[in-house]
Amino acid sequence: MKARIWMVGIAVVALVLVLSGGWLWRGAVASSPLAEKVNYDDQGRLLFPQDWRRWVLVGSSLGLGYSDREGPAGQQAFHHVLMEPSAFQHFERTGEFAEKTMFALAIYSQGSRESIARAGSYTKDLMAVEIALKDSERFDEGWAYFGFGTGRPASQAIDQSGCWSCHNQHGQRDNVFMQFYPVLREADPTAGR
């Protein structure tokens, strides 16, 4: 009888180890895609993430500008902000932006009165893509910003006095303009605390 109890005890311990090991393994796998998405060339330039169109849309705006010098009315651009999916999943779980989090700002021209469209406006042609990246190992400021235009394969970080200083001063959380991203606000597990 004692041998049977002992065997059941070993089986329970083995089951606990297998289940906890699976949990630990899933945690490691869940965090690894962030690092795998960020690639630099031999000159230290960020390589353009080719899969950015598959990222999670977290916010959009029309004509949102940060100064009085923006383009004239009627020439306003659409801005679509997308977040790399594994970074979004991490944010949903923790309310934090993990290292290697990337956002893409896709800037499109405004179209109107074409084909069957008689009123309103729509997203037309891609004008530029910019990437925000959290990489404290590489950038002392934590976040860096990159301009890729419409097809540049790699980009150096934009000078800190540009995008970084504005995001640092006005970003609602960790250099991120959450005030403009309703999907992030809704996904934030720390909201209301």
Feature map (PLM): residue ranges:
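N-terminal Sec-pathway targeting helices
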Residues: 1-12
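Short, structured beta-strand/loop micro-motifs enriched in basic residues and often containing a Trp
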Residues: 77-88
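Hydrophobic membrane-insertion alpha-helices, especially the h-region
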Residues: 10-20
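Sequence context surrounding c-type heme c attachment/ligation sites in exported
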Residues: 32, 38-41, 48-56, 60, ...
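Signal peptide processing junction and immediate N-terminal pro/mature segment
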Residues: 22-31
